[in-house]
Design a protein with these regions (language model features):
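Short alpha-helix
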Residues: 236-252
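Conserved class I S-adenosyl-L-methionine
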Residues: 43, 49-108, 122, 126, 207-232, ...
């Protein structure tokens, strides 16, 4: 993928997030022949968001200005290791253990993997290969550019990045064999819409692997006052286990298998078989 274009095989992957039509490539952009929307390519990364962070009325997008700035430290000891111990507790899993556990849930999957709110591909880069294509989406262009730089430096093939929102994914129905959603489900404004959109683009029986937070027994998130303040000030929603299981059921997933370490929640579930849910 160069700065201006996608390869033919990559172009076939994406659809218009507005009308789900296949796209054409011209003049450095992806264009929809059905609804006429155009999505620019930015340093080789297709942008399906089309909104400047500084001008957005959406609090989730405004937060991305901060996320853009921390892209370079995101995978250092200054970020996740600290977050996991403060939020999850000192007895919770290490960052390396967490990555290994989550990617292990989809490691045996053959085919295409969607990496939701992928950041710089922290989880997806570990499993991307010529035989396992990983498509990461995030609203932070800073994170995506950092991920593209890491991917090139590490010589990884099979990792792709696009700027898109989880509520309007630029992929066709039933396209993916598995989905990762790591460190982000608790930040989505509408959890049900996000999960239903993930289910839409997954094949029946496909695996969903998630890392998020719960009101557990470790870290500051075990305190109700802290959870309330994090929700109010930062939009961080800490899930109860019955709550997240209900969200999954209402989104077309089954076989919820949670694992709690301190206040860190990892789980996997499967999209219901065809015919059991509307999508």
């Amino acid at each position: 993928m160069n700065a201006a274009t996608l390869s033919g095989s990559e172009l076939e992957v994406y659809v218009c997030p507005a009308c789900k039509s296949h796209l054409m490539q011209e003049d450095g952009a992806l264009r929809c022949p059905t609804c006429s929307k155009a999505y620019p390519m930015r340093q080789g990364i297709p942008d399906f968001v089309l909104e400047e962070l500084s001008r957005s009325a959406d609090p989730e997008l405004r937060r991305m200005r901060f996320i853009d700035q921390m892209a370079r430290i995101y995978e250092t000891k200054l970020w996740y290791p600290v977050i996991l111990k403060v939020f999850g507790g000192f007895s919770s899993r290490s960052f390396a253990q967490l990555i290994s556990m989550v990617v292990g849930k989809v490691e045996a999957v053959k085919g295409r993997v969607l990496d939701i709110a992928c950041g710089p591909g922290t989880f997806g880069r570990r499993i991307a290969s010529p035989s396992k294509q990983v498509f990461g989406i995030d609203v932070s262009m800073g994170m995506l550019r950092q991920g593209a730089a890491y991917t090139a430096k590490e010589g990884i093939t099979g990792m792709h990045f696009a700027r898109a929102r989880v509520e309007a994914l630029p992929f066709a129905d039933g396209f993916f064999d598995a989905t990762l959603c790591c460190g982000s489900l608790h930040l989505f404004t509408d959890t049900l819409t996000a999960l239903r959109e993930m289910a839409r683009v997954m094949k029946p029986g496909a695996v969903l692997a998630v890392f998020t937070f719960t009101a557990g027994r470790g870290g500051v998130l075990r305190y109700r006052q802290v959870r309330a303040r994090m929700r109010r000030d930062h939009g961080l929603h800490v899930f109860e286990l019955p709550e997240i299981e209900q969200y999954l059921t209402d989104s077309g997933f089954e076989h919820f298998q949670p694992d709690v370490s301190g206040s860190i929640l990892t789980f996997n579930a499967r999209k219901q078989p065809a015919g059991k849910f509307p999508f």
